[in-house]
């Protein structure tokens, strides 16, 4: 009996001793700073200049690659990029055959939105894509990658950006089957011809696998499989319309997004009698969330918002959006279409014509990026949605979006617009965004309707909205209207 107990212990010890004997890197279990004294001992460098203790990667394909293999580790870097610089931190990868996809890649890219690669720093590329700017060019930032068992965490400036647990039988698209964890090399590489990446501090803590091997076996559901497949295609799965309402916190929202494989845009309600109602409250709000790993969005409430803010202040948001659910009818009555006692429908057809005209006026007059809660009609008309949204009315809305370069939201909560409307808009060249418009802390969904639309309408990455660079924001180019639109 004692002999049987000893055998497993001896086997484990043999494995550990074997690993240590083969391992030729920094001391396991301790944090080692990589500097000029030990750089050549542990790392192979290519086209890297060392100046005053800093590593400069200026040439395309400049790299720092480990001479040792690791599976579990903690790696932290203090870095800076100059404009145009893009790179990758690869792990579980190979020293050779860089053209083949093996292991995982963390993106380093601090360019403005819609400039170059859409994936930004902290993105676990093709697995948990991050499209949100987490750092800026010409500023030092901290990047940390942790691999423990089958868990991967990527943090930027102490904010968790990408989080992934690799299933034991990870499903990968053709050509990506090598994208799994293994004991292999780590490499920092520059992938762009322009700009420079600078590393001023690099620390690594190797972890002997057996000390930390807690592999979680779990089954993904069909929806998670769809999301994983879209992430592997680098489809931008972004919910641009999330609110911190009903007790929902920023940490809860970000955790929900990471767990489900997409990004969030968190919107402030800005307008008359709302918490954000002038430049001062707007700037205070933005200063409070500036470090959060979310898109910063402005929901323009009512029609009066154009009189309350300056374009310069509004341009602090990554994008702005509005709906056509609040306006004044031809009898001078103020309508809020989601409120039955504040909605007046004297004649169905006249109401729909008036609504269509209001949508056109809002899109023509207000410098918004996205039309949200689109095609929403009052509760008493919703059963006749397909009848009332005629081809002529749909065409008018689509044309208004096109001529003003406004994206059309696909709303996961209301499940609008209809597939027919979306197909018509796609054929015309309209861009799309996804949004939930949650009202409670427990009604964030998993973008089910949006995923259905991707399949049924054949949406691709090229069909999707991305925020404009700051210099190209509509609010700065178009300004605000001189009169309220509705």
Language-model-detected regions and their locations in the chain:
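Conserved, mostly hydrophobic/aromatic
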Residues: 241, 320, 373, 408, ...
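Extended substrate/RNA-proximal surfaces in nucleic-acid metabolism proteins
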Residues: 278-403, 455, 480-485
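N-terminal Sec-pathway targeting helices
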Residues: 1-13
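Short, charged, surface-exposed secondary-structure boundary motifs
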Residues: 116-118, 275-276, 329-333, 442-446
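An N-terminally biased module of ancient metal coordination in phosphate/nucleic-acid-related enzymes
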Residues: 221-304, 378-387, 396-397, 435, ...
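Charged catalytic cores and adjacent phosphate/nucleic-acid-binding surfaces used
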Residues: 220-233, 385-486
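Carbohydrate-interacting regions of secretory-pathway proteins
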Residues: 18-221
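Structural recognition of the beta-strand scaffold that forms the well-ordered cores
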Residues: 105-108, 264-266, 295, 321, ...
């Amino acid at each position: 009996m004692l002999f049987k107990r000893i055998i497993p212990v001896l086997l484990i010890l043999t494995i550990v001793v074997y690993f240590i004997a083969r391992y030729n890197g920094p001391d396991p279990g301790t944090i080692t700073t990589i500097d000029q004294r030990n750089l050549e001992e542990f790392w192979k460098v290519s086209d890297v200049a060392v100046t005053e203790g800093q590593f400069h990667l200026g040439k395309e394909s400049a790299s720092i690659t480990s001479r040792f293999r690791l599976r579990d580790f903690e790696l932290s870097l203090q870095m800076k990029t100059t404009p145009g610089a893009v790179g990758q931190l690869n792990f579980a990868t190979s020293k050779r055959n860089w053209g083949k996809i093996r292991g995982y890649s963390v993106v380093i890219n601090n360019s403005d939105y819609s400039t170059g690669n859409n994936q930004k720093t902290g993105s676990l590329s093709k697995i948990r894509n991050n499209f949100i700017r987490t750092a800026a060019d010409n500023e030092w930032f901290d990047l940390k990658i942790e691999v423990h068992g089958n868990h991967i965490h990527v943090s930027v400036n102490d904010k968790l950006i990408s989080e992934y647990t690799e299933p034991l039988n990870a499903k990968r698209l053709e050509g990506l089957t090598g994208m799994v964890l293994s004991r292999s090399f780590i490499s920092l590489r520059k992938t762009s011809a322009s700009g420079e990446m600078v590393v001023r501090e690099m620390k690594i803590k190797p972890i002997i696998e057996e000390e930390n091997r807690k592999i979680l076996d779990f089954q993904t559901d069909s929806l998670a499989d769809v999301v994983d497949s879209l992430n592997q295609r680098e489809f931008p799965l972004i919910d641009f319309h999330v609110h911190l309402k009903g007790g929902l916190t920023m940490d809860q929202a970000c955790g929900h997004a990471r767990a489900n494989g997409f990004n969030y845009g968190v919107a402030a309600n800005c307008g008359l009698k709302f918490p954000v109602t002038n430049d001062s409250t707007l700037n205070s709000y933005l200063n409070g969330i500036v470090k959060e790993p979310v898109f910063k969005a402005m929901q323009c409430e009512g029609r009066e918002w154009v009189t309350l803010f300056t374009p310069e202040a509004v341009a602090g948001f990554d994008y702005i959006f509005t709906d056509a659910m609040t306006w004044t009818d031809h009898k001078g009555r103020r309508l809020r279409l989601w409120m039955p006692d504040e909605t007046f429908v004297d004649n169905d057809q006249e109401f729909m014509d008036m609504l269509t005209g209001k949508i056109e006026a809002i899109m023509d007059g207000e410098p918004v990026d996205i039309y949200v809660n689109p095609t929403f009609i009052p509760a008493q008309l919703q059963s006749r949605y397909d009848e009332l949204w005629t081809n002529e009315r749909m065409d008018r809305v689509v044309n208004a979006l096109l001529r003003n370069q406004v994206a059309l939201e696909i709303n996961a909560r209301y499940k609008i617009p209809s597939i027919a409307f979306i197909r018509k808009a796609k054929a015309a060249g309209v861009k799309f965004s996804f949004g939930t418009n949650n009202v409670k802390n427990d009604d964030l969904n998993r973008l089910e309707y949006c995923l259905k639309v991707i399949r049924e309408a054949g949406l691709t990455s090229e069909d999707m909205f991305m925020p404009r660079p700051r210099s190209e924001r509509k609010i700065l180019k178009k300004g605000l209207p001189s009169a309220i639109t509705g």
